[in-house]
Amino acid sequence: MRVIASSIRKGNVIEQDGKLYVVVSAENIHPGKGTPVSQIEMRRISDGVKISERYKTTDQVEKATIEERNFTFLYEDGDGYHFMNPETYDQVQVSKDVVGDAAAYLQPDMTVKLSTHDVNVVSLALPQRVTLEVVETEPVTKGQTASSSYKPAVLSNGIRTTVPPHIAVGTRIVVMTEDGSYSERAKD
């Protein structure tokens, strides 16, 4: 399907020169003089090579037809990550290149969205928030509960983040998967 370049967003899949690219970032630039352009950074799905392209905002770009489905994460082995379709119980293996940094947040039985083109998995979308346990942080300081300062912490998946002073080791917290930031204390 052909669309204008200015409508391309992060996560879209573009077909160019017979190859598929997933959009890493897309920005529309309107200079004071001259024609507005769309600056698009893409990662080639087949081998992970990153490229950057500039299009006039009115140029036509071939947007690939992508099918999104919910899958359940099962396990990881040396070959990649294994997911199951909860409706058909079909299993699919996804390479480490496609999963990328999202691997740190994957937990058994977690539901994720896998985007496929033909039969190939091209991208993975995590839930917005995950619950993790704090495994290392400074001790709780009495009297600092209303402070807006944060202290460093290491989570059960190895990610480093900052948490409020009242959070102690062993506390389960909700973390945003997009940037690894603290959201709230878990309610479970």
UniProtKB/Swiss-Prot annotation:
Source organism: Bradyrhizobium diazoefficiens (strain JCM 10833 / BCRC 13528 / IAM 13628 / NBRC 14792 / USDA 110)
Subcellular location: Cytoplasm
Family stated for the protein in its record: Belongs to the elongation factor P family.
Cited Pfam families: EFP, EFP_N, Elong-fact-P_C
Listed CDD domains: S1_EF-P_repeat_1, S1_EF-P_repeat_2
GO molecular function: translation elongation factor activity
Function: Involved in peptide bond synthesis. Stimulates efficient translation and peptide-bond synthesis on native or reconstituted 70S ribosomes in vitro. Probably functions indirectly by altering the affinity of the ribosome for aminoacyl-tRNA, thus increasing their reactivity as acceptors for peptidyl transferase.
BP terms from Gene Ontology: peptide biosynthetic process
The name this protein goes by in its record: Elongation factor P
UniProt-listed NCBIfam families: efp (TIGR00038), PRK00529.1 (NF001810)
InterPro entries in the cross-refs: Elong-fact-P_C, NA-bd_OB-fold, Rib_uL2_dom2, Transl_elong_fac_P/YeiP, Transl_elong_KOW-like, Transl_elong_P/YeiP_cen, Transl_elong_P/YeiP_CS, Transl_elongation_fac_P
Domain of life: Bacteria
